């Protein structure tokens, strides 16, 4: 595991790389992280759990995401995170590890990763439909002129 920040403190938002996405958790101190385990352990969605830092990062690059405009202090963030320990309501689109961390820090469950993917998919659908419409119009005009 590699860290690029000198000191991690309880309440810090940790981010670690995964294949195609990033995983998020809250550092509790004493080498422990609380996070929504989600699909980390296979196809079954897991609960909010406490794990050691090495297990959380799985040997991947891990860094602190700094929040200058956090609503809750580091101490309050830890308390909020612990209040959801064992919660088992993981949902990739509406209640994942990133939603969990942002709720702990801001009281707003949001996931910029999910938003980015949703916008990308919607754009592709719209562009695909637009392209299909142009092709259909072109074919219609060619048939009409025969």
Language-model-detected regions and their locations in the chain:
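Cysteine-nucleophile amide-bond enzymes
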Residues: 1-146
